[in-house]
Amino acid sequence: NNKTIPDSMQIIKDYIKENYYEELTLSNISKVVFLSESHISRMFKREFGKSIVAYINEVRLVHAREMLMNSNRSIDEICYAVGYKSRNMFYKYFKAVYGKTPNMYRRSINEKHD
């Protein structure tokens, strides 16, 4: 019995990956697949074991981490470039996932390469 991901859920994942830097809301995501917000929320959580918001944060943080490692952009520039509207939220999520603030993370990378 091969478990397949419903097309609508894969479309949502792809949409988030391609538009992570935009303002993503359940409302605008639900319009992409022509389903209700509550329906896509339930289905996404059932299929992937995480909420749509958690997945958006995951995608954004991966991009932020890459920018911290591979660019000289300021933390604020990176924060807004990956779609966060609030610096505090960016710091909070980043630290929760990587155990360090973005500044500390960048410093630790630079120390490894010195």
What are these regions (language model features)?
Residues 32, 81-82, 97:
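Residues within the alpha-helical elements of helix-turn-helix
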Residues 1-2:
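Hydrophobic, helix-rich cores of sensory/ligand-binding and other regulatory modules
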Residues 5-8:
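Flexible loop/N-cap segments at domain edges
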Residues 92-114:
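…primarily DNA-binding HTH/wHTH and HhH modules…
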Residues 36-37, 85-86:
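Short coil turns linking two alpha-helices in DNA-binding domains
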